[in-house]
């Protein structure tokens, strides 16, 4: 799940869903990993993929038919999903405070967040390599 740990004002509150977010975080039957990383890493500005690449097209349309770098929140979540502990550390020494004031403690094996193992510049290079290279 993408969202901030302390009173996230975007991902966990969109569409007036704070109570739904609370229910999901409390009752989801498998481990949940929270990621709030990527806001300081801009990727995708040098897309060298083929013109029919869906990644290239998404960046192009997002920026009104031009190429610019974008914050990498989504890319961090995907990178964790496919590369996992090789690129991030799972931690549970914190808690989440939702906008409605509810506090949820992290629990090993159930509710974690990820912490970086590398510098933002290193993540930028990895993500750009994966999304910007030409198809082979």
Spans of features found by a protein language model:
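N-terminal acidic, glycine/proline-rich low-complexity segments
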Residues: 1-136
